[in-house]
Amino acid sequence: GFAIWFGFVPLIHIWLNQTKKESARLTFLSAIISNTIAFYWIGLNSGASFIPVFLSLTGAVLYLSFLLAIFGWIISWFEIKRRGIALIIIPFLWVTMEWLRSFGPLGFPWANLAITQTKFLPIIQIIDFTGSEGIGFWIMILNTYIYYLIINNSVNKKIITLFIIFIIPWIYGTLRIDQLNDKEWEFRTVAAIQPNINPNQKWEPTYRKTLISIMDSLNNEAYNMKPKLVLWPEAALPVYMRVSSIKQVYEKKVYESNIPLIMGTVDFKRDKVDRKVFNGSIYFGLNENKIYHKLLLVPFAEYIPLSEKFSFLKQLNFGQANFSHGSEFTTFPLDSIYFSNIICYESSHPSIARGFINNGARFLTIQANDAWLQNSSGVRQHFELARLRAIEFRTGIIRSANTGISGIIDPTGLIKHKVNFSDQEVFQGDVLLNKGLTFYASFGNLFSQLCFVLILLQGAFILISKK
């Protein structure tokens, strides 16, 4: 929200006036508090036992807080080495930190500051150029300039400059939204299902017939709307749909109606060594079926990091699923175009959406199951991430959650339809097609990379000049 526009001012004071060690320590303590508040919902996972859930929450909070402590240490180092420079480099180093934090098996761009600004739609329009890190850059410029005005006792003299810094993204974003709204957009009409099924009950053998009956009833309702595509949520039925006998029911439905269907399903492959299981989706197309295997898995929930290289790690039991990673940015044919499907946690990583868009997807579907998180802020955060992806790639998105928040989002990030947590609903709407590659789709995190290079050059300059 708006508090973050000035909320870093006390920390900036610490970074610029404490030793490196004390700066890191105080940053770590403050980050423990803020990260616990932001991500407490990790500890609400009803799909696992208490110990692994508690360890997941603790590990995530400590990891994110440690990274911020390093940030505080580096800022203090710059200030000690060359007084006055640290205040200038804070926005650039923040972008660098957010970008580097997205890499590796523990990458977590979910924590980027952009997610705090989705209520202010004009502000976040710049991310089709900068990526979500651009919002963190603007927030840090605001905070550093406010701090500068306070310590120099010049708030009254330079308030106009502060106002200009504040208002620029609002003006740009408002004009950009108006420009996009004036354009003619192609679209495809898609129907989606939010069945609101208890995920623990879903896998009980005694509930299987009831579940199939519920899903078939909702599916018939969706087909009666005569869309171009029907979307089901993640892991919709407790079967390996690709090899299940009930697959024929849905193939027949697609054939008779001439309307494709995409549903979440688990899948498997056998090779000479072992049997690999995937979280994925199956597309019942008009000419063929097609499978997508989830590329980005949730660490310690869907797999153990590095377990695909070191198989003995799979013997560890934290209640995780031991899925394998997919390997292809799959696109699905829909009349004359292609679209792609993102599964749950993947929507937090722009690199996944970018891979699909660059592979020819004209719009994105998202399948999710947020029931594990109960009705927490994590559910709402997860939906807001989809709005960021829509803006970054100027593409329409439709989201189907088992329960959570389902909906339709347009290329400006505007929510066109929304289904609340615990509601059961079948809905239909027009999903807008992207008009081509945005700057961010074409060049990726160029802005973040430039910030990283500037930090390296400044650090190198200080080290060389001291010698």
Annotated model-derived regions:
Residues 1-177, 375, 386-389, 401-403, ...:
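Membrane-embedded alpha-helical bundles of multi-pass enzymes
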Residues 178-443:
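Soluble catalytic domains of enzymes that build or remodel membrane lipids, polysaccharides, and related
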